[in-house]
């Protein structure tokens, strides 16, 4: 399979195999007017299998969303067909409006204008909890 190179944009690389669609949805890439390529289960010498997302064009991406889904992913910034920056991600301590609280008793269920805020409570397990009701993010 051949996917063309990127002129200006970014490559989200080293995504754990099977996680790219979740990332695609959370980043809102379906709204992108630029070219987006999603590659699932690409062969990787380091990971065995991995997913990759290529964005050819300008589309704002929240790095905290990527780090929440897969903190081992890397970001490659491409300008004029050349890799100009490589970013490693840090697990975010706080997520705002990235995921919604699923607890029907949470105040965010009735107060629609409230931000959905989750904090990292168990860094070793990647567990986030709602600041209002302490429900775990799914």
Could you say what each language-model-derived stretch is?
Residues 84-138:
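Cys/His-clustered metal-coordination modules, chiefly Zn-binding fingers
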Residues 1-87:
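Interaction interfaces in information-processing and related assembly proteins
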